[in-house]
């Protein structure tokens, strides 16, 4: 049985990796070995940052809620506690969106939270 050289398979594999490395700087988009290393590292970065994205958005929402709450004479922690005591079940994403898009509605929630804590 003759030996199969595998040129077609190797070429396809190399093309696939170089296509994934398109847009990378320098040899990372030109040379197969370097490109392969960078594609693998990029996959690791993507995996890690898909998890970090959730934390980052939560931080952003909390910062926005805190800023809006301070404009209404309270703090983030007091407001969230007040809403929990009042039985208002609203998540931070919606609360942050409300603070931006409907300041009057947010003010009403802030007043409700202040009343329920006292």
Swiss-Prot record:
Disulfide bonds: none annotated. InterPro entries: Ribosomal_bL20, RIBOSOMAL_L20_CS, Ribosomal_protein_bL20_C. The keyword Secreted does not apply. The keyword rRNA-binding applies. Pfam families: Ribosomal_L20 (PF00453). Keywords: Ribonucleoprotein, Ribosomal protein, RNA-binding, rRNA-binding. GO terms for molecular function: rRNA binding; structural constituent of ribosome. Belongs to the bacterial ribosomal protein bL20 family. Binds directly to 23S ribosomal RNA and is necessary for the in vitro assembly process of the 50S ribosomal subunit. It is not involved in the protein synthesizing functions of that subunit. This is Large ribosomal subunit protein bL20.
């Amino acid at each position: 049985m003759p030996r199969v050289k595998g040129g077609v398979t190797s070429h396809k594999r190399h093309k696939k990796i170089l296509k994934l490395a398109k847009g990378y700087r320098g040899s990372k988009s030109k040379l197969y070995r370097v490109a392969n290393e960078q594609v693998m590292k990029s996959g690791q970065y993507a995996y890690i940052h898909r998890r970090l994205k959730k934390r980052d958005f939560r931080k952003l929402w909390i910062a926005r809620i805190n800023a809006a709450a301070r404009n209404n004479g309270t703090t983030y922690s007091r407001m969230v506690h007040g809403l929990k005591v009042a039985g208002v079940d609203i998540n931070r994403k919606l609360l942050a969106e409300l603070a931006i898009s409907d300041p009057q509605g947010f003010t009403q929630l802030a007043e409700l939270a202040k009343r329920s804590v006292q």
